[in-house]
A protein has these predicted regions:
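Acidic, Ser/Pro/Thr-rich low-complexity regulatory regions
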Residues: 1-140
């Protein structure tokens, strides 16, 4: 009986890790604090997919934070920085600065990142709900 429970636990843990992988940059873009809270939750011995789903869903109601969004974009940029040209880098930093100054919106920044993603494919980022805009589809 215990062995079956261990397998189920591993499956649940794996499901949670997959769900988190898809949503972590979205969560980070909304709240660094919630991002850290969820990371701590996932270190627990027992995790629950529905509980994780709820935690992720709750960030949808959090008011936009330019600082947290910018932080998430800089994390995502880390996947491109070795391949992208200086012009592409400057393009991102310019559009991000304009966003911080209120001259454009998150969609503009995400659109630019998605342009880089087409040029420099990355399966992990291609499944990120921050970049796909599929925040309603947070189940793994």
């Amino acid at each position: 009986m215990k062995e079956g429970a261990d397998v189920k636990h591993k499956d649940t843990k794996k499901e949670c890790e997959e769900l988190w992988a898809k949503n972590k940059y979205y969560v980070l873009s909304k709240s660094h604090k919630v991002y850290l809270d969820i990371r701590e939750y996932l270190k627990e011995k027992e995790v629950d997919i529905l509980s994780l789903h709820e935690k992720i869903q709750k960030v949808r109601d959090i008011k936009e934070s330019k600082k947290d969004f910018s932080n998430a974009i800089l994390h995502v940029w880390g996947y491109f920085k070795k391949e992208a040209s200086e012009i592409e880098k400057q393009g991102l930093f310019n559009i991000l600065e304009e966003y911080m100054e209120g001259k454009n919106n998150q969609e503009s920044v995400i659109k630019y990142i998605n342009t880089l993603l087409k040029k420099y494919p990355n399966k992990y980022l291609q499944e990120s709900t921050l970049l796909t805009g599929e925040q309603n589809e947070t189940m793994a």
